[in-house]
Amino acid sequence: MITRNYETLYIIRPDVGEEQLEQTISQFRTFLEEQGATKLKVQNRGKRRFAYPIKKLREGYYILMTYTAPGTAIAPLERAMRLNENILRFMTIVLEEETETEDAEEENPVLARA
C-alpha cells in the first residue's frame, strides 16, 4: 500500500468546552491511527478570529495534523469531519516529498551579470 504525507487543518467551534475540544482532537487522532497513519503530529494552533463569518461565528480553534497515511484513509476521515457538528471547516492537502533542492541550488549557482 502506497503511503503519502498529508496535512489536515480543521476548525472547531469556539463555543465547545475545553474537555470537548480535547475529546474531538483525540477522536480524529485515534481515527487516523486506526486507518494506519504513522508519524502523526497534532498541533493546537489556538483560537483565532476569522476574516469573515462561518456559520454565523467569528472565531474558532485551529487544529493542524501532519501525518503519513495510505490514500484510502483520507475519504473516511473527511466524511467523519463532515458529520461532526463541532467542525466548521477542514482541508486536507498532500505534502510534497522532501527533496534536496537546497543542495542542487548550491551546486549550480546563478551567475549575476556585471
Swiss-Prot record:
| UniProt GO molecular function | small ribosomal subunit rRNA binding; structural constituent of ribosome
For the biological process aspect of GO, one term held by this record is: translation
Is Cell membrane among the key words of this record? Answer: no
User: Which UniProt keywords are listed?
Assistant: Ribonucleoprotein, Ribosomal protein, RNA-binding, rRNA-binding
Short name of any one Pfam family annotated for the protein: Ribosomal_S6
GO annotation, cellular component aspect: cytoplasm; ribonucleoprotein complex; ribosome
Q: Which family does it belong to?
A: Belongs to the bacterial ribosomal protein bS6 family.
User: What is the role of this chain?
Assistant: Binds together with bS18 to 16S ribosomal RNA.
Q: What is this protein called?
A: Small ribosomal subunit protein bS6
Q: Which organism is it from?
A: Thermosynechococcus vestitus (strain NIES-2133 / IAM M-273 / BP-1)
